């Protein structure tokens, strides 16, 4: 987890990401990391990432007050503009695709939107942000191996939901996204 502070926070939207330069000369490529929460009053954003190699491992060694070269915000983010307290929204996240949904949930909950969140992980050790997301609505957790929550992937839960959703927002692995695209193919806000 990183908490960044700066003027660019004012331009951030839920669902966007930042390109972070690894603070050493051996790593030339920037790392794209999703924004998990935004606090415009404090000009701070929180990034939750998984250590995948030497570059992200270096991020984990940073201390408060260290500076980073950051490009962003990048991406379009999610359009939440017309959702209100009469709306019901489905959030679907898988693995490291869960963090960007936290800001979406926070903003929609503040408007009174009813949220149902379905999270998918490989196993119990990979589960993140369940409690934080539960502050904003109902949360279902699936694990591939059944070590926590419901055994299977997000489709096991989604196929049993009988609710009509005004919007569906998702972030995760290509296989999960393919399922969401097929399942909600005709949905105008998926």
Give residue spans per PLM region.
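Ferredoxin-reductase
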Residues: 1-66
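FNR/FR-type flavoprotein reductase catalytic core
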Residues: 54-190
